[in-house]
Amino acid sequence: MSGRGKGGKGLGKGGAKRHRKILRDNIQGITKPAIRRLARRGGVKRISGLIYEEVRAVLKSFLESVIRDAVTYTEHAKRKTVTSLDVVYALKRQGRTLYGFGG
């Protein structure tokens, strides 16, 4: 917070900007075995080789929409930290109610 006291909103002395690593191609971190395990949990026995890239694309678009909504809730509340409730409300807005995380 660099010397702004509790709840340091407003302009004032900003801290030094840290260098952020540019994130790219992280979707490949969802590995083939991880997708296979999820499919097994869903009752799938055999998996085509073409499925993996398709699953990554669908998962990426789903997460982008949920995260976009969650960040919108966070910004509206004038916070910088996305809470679990923001994600719960974002999922509820998309018709996928999630129980067990409050709200």
Curated annotation (Swiss-Prot):
Disulfide bond sites: none
Xref: InterPro entries: CENP-T/H4_C, Histone-fold, Histone_H4, Histone_H4_CS
N6-acetyl-N6-methyllysine: residues carrying this PTM: 6, 13
GO function terms (MF aspect): DNA binding; protein heterodimerization activity; structural constituent of chromatin
PTM annotation (N6-methyllysine): residues: 6, 9, 13
Post-translational modification summary for this protein: Glutarylation at Lys-92 (H4K91glu) destabilizes nucleosomes by promoting dissociation of the H2A-H2B dimers from nucleosomes.
A cellular component annotation (GO) from this entry: nucleosome
Regions recorded as binding DNA: 17-21
N6-glutaryllysine modifications at: 92
Subunit annotation: The nucleosome is a histone octamer containing two molecules each of H2A, H2B, H3 and H4 assembled in one H3-H4 heterotetramer and two H2A-H2B heterodimers. The octamer wraps approximately 147 bp of DNA.
Recorded family membership: Belongs to the histone H4 family.
Function: Core component of nucleosome. Nucleosomes wrap and compact DNA into chromatin, limiting DNA accessibility to the cellular machineries which require DNA as a template. Histones thereby play a central role in transcription regulation, DNA repair, DNA replication and chromosomal stability. DNA accessibility is regulated via a complex set of post-translational modifications of histones, also called histone code, and nucleosome remodeling.
Name the record gives this protein: Histone H4
Organism: Candida glabrata (strain ATCC 2001 / BCRC 20586 / JCM 3761 / NBRC 0622 / NRRL Y-65 / CBS 138) (Yeast)
